[in-house]
């Protein structure tokens, strides 16, 4: 990831919206900048990652069926860039909207294992309901 120069508010996608395979999104976080760990960055970091199909992510050479409809995969088939330890909970922003939340993975930046994100659009109704309750 490289340093991120500004922070802004990003809206959520509509219920059930999805980004097509190959769409390039941006993940941001304060986590480790290398798979081996090491010192955490002193600035917010960001990386551009393409959306990976559920079929590829669920292949026997990757997550072998463990990816559900509530998840999004993103990363390069060559590896090299990814969210990593300490980035969990951070946003995956696509077209200016928070489509994913950093969830889990197998190592970091491994070409066989894209990063796994919670699919925000699958929970949009719940987010709206909770927001309405909080405003009462």
Q: What annotation goes with each model-predicted range?
A:
Residues 1-136:
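Extracellular "complement/coagulation-type" protease architecture
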């Amino acid at each position: 990831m490289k340093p991120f120069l500004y922070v802004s508010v990003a809206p959520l996608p509509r219920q059930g919206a999805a980004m097509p395979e190959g769409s390039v999104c941006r993940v941001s976080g304060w986590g480790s900048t290398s798979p081996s760990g090491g010192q955490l960055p002193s600035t917010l970091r960001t990386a551009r990652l393409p959306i990976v199909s559920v079929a590829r992510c669920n292949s026997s050479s990757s997550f072998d069926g463990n990816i559900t409809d509530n998840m999004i995969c993103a990363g390069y088939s060559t590896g090299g860039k990814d969210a990593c330890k300490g980035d969990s909970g951070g946003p995956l922003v696509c077209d200016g909207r928070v489509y994913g939340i950093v969830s889990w993975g197998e190592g970091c930046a491994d070409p066989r294992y894209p990063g796994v994100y919670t699919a925000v659009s699958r929970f949009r109704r719940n987010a709206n309901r909770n927001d309405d309750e909080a405003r009462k």
